[in-house]
Each structure stands twice: as structure tokens, then as C-alpha cells.
Amino acid sequence: MPSSATSTYLLSLKQVSLTASSPLLLQLKDRFFHQPKLLNMGFSTGKRKSRDEEEDRVSFFASEFPMDDLNDDVLERVLSWLPTSCFFRMSSVCKRWKSSQTSKSFKLACSQIPTRDPWFFMIDNDSNSSSFVFDSTENSWKNLNRRDFLHHHRQDFIPVASSGGLLCYRCSISGDFLLRNPLTGSSRDIPSQDNNNNKPLQAVAMTTTTVTPSSYTLVTISGEIPNLSFKIYESNADSWSKDQELESVKNNDSSLHDDYDTDSGTVYFLSKQGNVVVASNNLQRSPSKQYSSVITVTDEAEIVYFLSSYGTIVACDLTKRCFTELPKLLPPFLEYSIDLVECEGTMYVILLSEFFESASLRIWRLDNNREWVQVGMLPPALSHELYGKKGDINCVGGAGNKILVCFNASPPEVYCRYFVYDLVAEEWNELPKCFKDGEAVDFVSALSFQPRIEATV
């Protein structure tokens, strides 16, 4: 077995040893896995420990605990802890491992893994042709390149949401939805919603459960403020709920939208070129983020957040059936790009702005006092490189408190950068360029999913 594959196998044995009652597995933790953890703060340099040291440790361990000695039950539990990419590589050369892909007990073991490092499904300008993902475990690009990834008659389907191990697509013509596991290729059409009185769709959100059997929920927000409503699709019932109205709740620090509904609400400001400009309330969204939203689920409430057409953050409480607009972070006369993400049940705002001849990219969250608190900032040396590019940011939150920021500037100068921020380690990483047939591939946005073989539609 290659040393790198064996090393990953050892890590999966470590995970099993932490939960198993087998004396053989329990002793693994004590004998081989007391390693100090190092944390790099700031911008990651990606340093690794000595290859010789790792290979010596792996060779010794493999001779002590050969895999052939593991029974099927223990083997499947070990395999379930493997990173998904490693499992696919290793199962391709071992019939015994390959057969586990269809095993119900193996899928059950996989479903009991609390979380997996996220994969980022990248979306280019031609949203329905995307097939590249970034594997955050191995820090590498992968081309799913499945001939059946989306059938030719489904080229009008655009990725709009994700949760767990599933991606959600929406047909730009009919409005129908399609759920898909990008790893296995399994898919399912979602029945059409009943007539929604031609209300414009504002947002699509999705949640999943990893328990067996797995289930998922789709939420759609429709209408125009202040007349919003929502519908919920439950996979267990295979049906949509009735259209439910959302009541508007006003706050003293609520959005500036009301001020701009009056004739006297127009704001003028002086641009850098010395021209008088009218502040616009019209938010320009990337087509790939047209229905983008995030959903947070707690014991008290389910809340869907999305950006309104005039740039405010709308919070829709599905439990109380009401919505409110959150206070803006910046006044309308400042040019900026904004997006929302969710990590571990918390909504974050990513904001790119230019001020005093420099660019600033910051991450914010709303505290209990409804005040914005900064939780992260791209190092100034990097953010300054984005200055003057007139670019847009599209972001997504992933499992493990990771946030991907896609920066892209439109022609005449195409300029794309991709940054990942770890909220826990407070560490930024820039993703390498992605290449196909020797040419760089550019992306405008992404969706985050966990690579779960067991996720069913």
C-alpha cells in the first residue's frame, strides 16, 4: 500500500479507536497518536513534517496492525473515517474495499461521521456546465467530469443551494428543482410547486439531516417586500406546504429602505472623478447568486437570510412567520460588494469596500445587541491587491467553520482570486489556480457540500 494511503488509513483507525470498545483499537490511541497540534496564525504557509519521519511511522504501524486482520465490521468503520478522495482511490485497487460502497452497514457507518471537510463546487459563467470542485482536505482541485453529471436535456438547470452531501438545481425555464449527489450521480426531480400567484422568487434555502434514512428540506421565499411568503418542501412527505405569509416586523434600527421610499429620500454624493452621482438602492447580483440565501436552524427558530434588491439583509423567521430587515453596515454612497454565509448555525456577512485608496475585505456577524462585530479581515497586503479592480465577491460557508471568498472582476480585465478563511484558526489561505487542458479556469461563485457517499435523494 502506498505510504500516503496508509497514512490516511492510520488516521481513520485513530478516529475509530476513539469510539470503539475493542481493546485492539483502544490501544491504538495510546500507542501511536499522541501528537502535539500546531496552529499557524495569519496566512498559511502549508508546511508539513518530514516525509522520512512519516514513512517510518507508517511502516512500523502497518506491520503491527495489518488490514487483513480486520473483520468486515471493523474495516467498514475504519473506511467510513477515510477522507472521501482517499476512499475512492484505495477502493479502486481493492475488491474488498470496493464492495463496501454498496454495503448498507458501511453507509450507516458513514452517516455517523459528524462532519466532513467541505468540498467547494465551483460555478463559472456558464453555470450549468460546472464540474470542478476544490477538496479542502487535500487542498487540490478535482474534475468530477461525469458524463451523466447533468443530462443534455437538463442544461437549463442552475445550482442554487446545497446542504450536507447534496446540491440543489433550479430550472431557469420551468422553475422545477433537481436534487443531486455530485459524488454518486444519483438525482431526483422535485415536484413542481402549486401556482404561487406569479410572485417573484427571492431566495432558495436547503437543510439536510445525516441520520439514516437521511432527509432534506427546501425553502423558497417569494414576493416583494413587504409582501413576502414562503413554502417548504419535505422529502419525507414528498410534497410542498401551502403558501404562508410573512408578517413585517419593524425595528428602530431597521433598514434605510423606508427613507428612500419618499420623494425627499434621494442621496447625492461626489465620486472620485468629481461627478455628482445618485446613490442607488439597486443591488447588482451575479446570476449564479440570484436566489442565494443562508438558513440557520436552532432549537428556537429557523431563519432564512437573503439580500434584498436594494442591498439590505432580510431575516425571515419561519417559526414565527415574520421578517425584518437588518441594519446596513455601510451607507449607500459607498461602493461595496456584499454576501452572506452560514457556518455552524451563525450567519456572517462578508464585505468588500474601497476607502482611502485601498480595499478592505472583512467578515462580520450580528451580536445579541443587534450590533455588527468584526470577526475576520483579509491581511491588508492581500486586500490592497484587489483595489481598483472593480470586482465582485461571492462567498459560501462550509463545514468546519470555513468560508470561501471568490473575487472576480469583469472584462476588460478578467481577474479572479479565491480565499478560504478558517474562523477557528483565524487563518487565511489562497487557493491555487485551477487548470484544464493547460489553461486556467475562472469561477464566479461556489456552493459548499460535504462529500458524503451515503447521501441519498
UniProtKB/Swiss-Prot annotation:
Signal peptide: none annotated. It comes from the Eukaryota. It holds the Pfam family F-box. InterPro entries: F-box-like_dom_sf, F-box_dom, Gal_Oxase/kelch_b-propeller, KIB1-4_b-propeller, SCF_F-box_component. Residues 64-110 form the F-box domain. PANTHER family: BNACNNG10540D PROTEIN (PTHR31672), F-BOX DOMAIN-CONTAINING PROTEIN (PTHR31672:SF7). This is F-box only protein 13. It comes from Arabidopsis thaliana (Mouse-ear cress). The gene is FBX13.
